[in-house]
Structure formats: C-alpha cells, structure tokens
Amino acid sequence: MRPTIVFDFDGVIHKGYDGWRDGSIYGEIDEGLLNYMTYLSQMYNIVISSCRPATQIVMFLDAYCRKNDIDLEFEIMDDRNMFWSKYGVVGVTNMKPAGALYVDDRGFRYDNLKDFIKFMEGFGR
C-alpha cells in the first residue's frame, strides 16, 4: 500500500488565510503546491483535510484547477473509512484521516515531553 500524505487546506493550500470570516475561500491558492501534489500523487496517496465542508473544497479546487490547467482530480472521502487509496485522485475530508505525513501550518513535531514542555513555556507569549 502506498503511504498517504495529508495536507491541511487553510494556511497551506489556501494561503493568506486570516480567520474564518464569512466562510468563503478568499485568500490566494498555492498553485506551486498543487502542481507538486500532481507529482507526489504518482508515488503517494494524497488527502486534503480541513474543518471546512469537504464539498466546498472539492467544488472550489475543481474549478481552480480547470481554470489553471492543473491536472488534479478531487473526491470527497467516505467518513466511515479514514484510509485513502485511490490512485491519482485527491481525497478531501473534514475528518483526520490516516496518514504517514501531515503537512500543516500550525503543527508541532512531537519527539519527547521535555522538548514539548520547553516549547509550551514560550507558546502564546
């Protein structure tokens, strides 16, 4: 089975994200990342995960990719199955799917408690 890479939508693909506002997708899209995802999809399963409705992301990215000649296909994942394995199709969900790698603008790489405590002592200051 091919490993899965999970990309967050807001702050990663949807750049310039500055809060929910009215719920629309108002920022710029990282077109270079979408093109790179096309390349990655040859070796990995690709998933986009977000708090947004998956339907909104699929409709937006389908239109964006058609307009910009980006060869990606998107499909809403079945929320009863958190594993994605459709070759060449990007799964989209508002759940946290199984993945080998998570790409997120707000993540922390946890290695051990000592380093996490040190990070937390400076967090939010």
Please give the residue ranges for each predicted region.
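Catalytic phosphate/metal-binding cores of nucleic-acid and nucleotide-processing enzymes, i.e., regions
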Residues: 1-125
